[in-house]
């Protein structure tokens, strides 16, 4: 796993529901919501209903942000998988989940419910992380050699760690460029170019949110691998919808989760009400 997390915000008050933009990481993730409503995702700010994915959901690798319903307080646990781990954990090529969310039951069948029940019985966040770690390690250990990440992709991922130069990754893979792209997309879920782009963004985001970040956006841009500050700003806006300076001022509690302004939802709601009124007139 790349990382595991758990939230244990138990409270007696009714949950506060809002929306947030989840920023892309290029990696797949698995999340269990153990209290409150099911996980709901939205196609955009104009989507007032959303789509429910139940209380256990898998998010495939993606290079674009998405909108979800944020519920606070919440009790949840999840994991972000290392690039190339999707097929070992879920039994399907990463490219089949790219840019998608699916209910875990579609991939694990009845095991999804059993794991969810076990997590519900765990009394602490630490115990939930321990349980989920065990489940994922067992599934990875039980996977067949067929699901292992090809050595060419492993070499490329190591070369791309800290670099956005796809040519370096292709050269390190030791196979032809076309074969490299096909192998990489199957194992990682994104093409080498898209994966390198989103990981460069994540490096920049890491620098931007450090306790003592590098002075100046130009310094951050160069440290992350961008050509210049203008290039960094364009990419940052494309991924987040806001400028780096605006992101800093918002100071989200979790760097990959950007709260959606309530006004955007209210505007969409009024637009929908006007449309409904026109239709009934």
Label every PLM stretch briefly.
Residues 1-177, 187-192, 206-227, 243-281:
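Alpha-helical bundle regulatory/interaction domains
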Residues 165, 200, 231:
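Residue-level recognition of oxygen-bearing side chains
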Residues 193-198, 204:
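Amphipathic alpha-helical "recognition" segments
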Residues 179-188, 196-199:
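Catalytic DNA-binding helix-loop module of base-excision-repair DNA glycosylases/AP lyases
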Residues 184, 196, 236-237, 248:
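DNA major-groove recognition helix of helix-turn-helix
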Residues 200, 236, 252:
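Positions that flank functional sites
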């Amino acid at each position: 796993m790349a990382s595991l997390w758990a939230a244990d915000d138990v409270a007696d008050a009714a949950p506060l529901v809002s929306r947030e933009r989840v920023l892309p990481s290029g990696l797949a993730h698995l999340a269990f919501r153990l209290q409150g409503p099911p996980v709901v995702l939205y196609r955009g700010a104009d989507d007032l209903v959303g789509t429910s994915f139940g209380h256990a959901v898998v998010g495939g690798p993606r290079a674009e942000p998405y909108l979800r319903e944020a519920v606070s307080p919440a009790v949840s646990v999840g994991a972000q998988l290392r690039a190339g781990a999707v097929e070992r954990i879920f039994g399907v090529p990463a490219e089949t989940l790219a840019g998608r969310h699916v209910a875990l039951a579609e991939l694990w069948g009845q095991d999804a419910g059993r794991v969810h029940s076990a997590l519900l019985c765990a009394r602490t966040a630490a115990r939930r992380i321990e349980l989920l770690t065990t489940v994922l390690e067992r599934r990875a250990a039980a996977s067949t050699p067929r699901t292992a990440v090809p050595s060419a992709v492993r070499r490329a991922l190591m070369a791309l760690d800290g670099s956005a130069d796809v040519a370096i990754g292709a050269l390190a893979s030791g196979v032809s460029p076309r074969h490299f792209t096909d192998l990489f997309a199957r194992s990682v879920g994104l093409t080498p170019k898209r994966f390198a782009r989103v990981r460069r963004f994540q490096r920049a985001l890491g620098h931007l949110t450090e306790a003592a970040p590098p002075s100046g956006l130009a310094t951050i841009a160069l440290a992350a691998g961008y050509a210049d500050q203008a290039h960094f700003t364009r990419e940052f806006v494309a991924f987040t919808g806001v400028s780096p300076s605006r992101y800093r001022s918002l100071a989200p509690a979790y760097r990959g989760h950007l709260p959606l302004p309530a006004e955007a939802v209210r505007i969409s709601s009024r637009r929908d009400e006007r449309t409904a009124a026109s239709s009934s007139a």
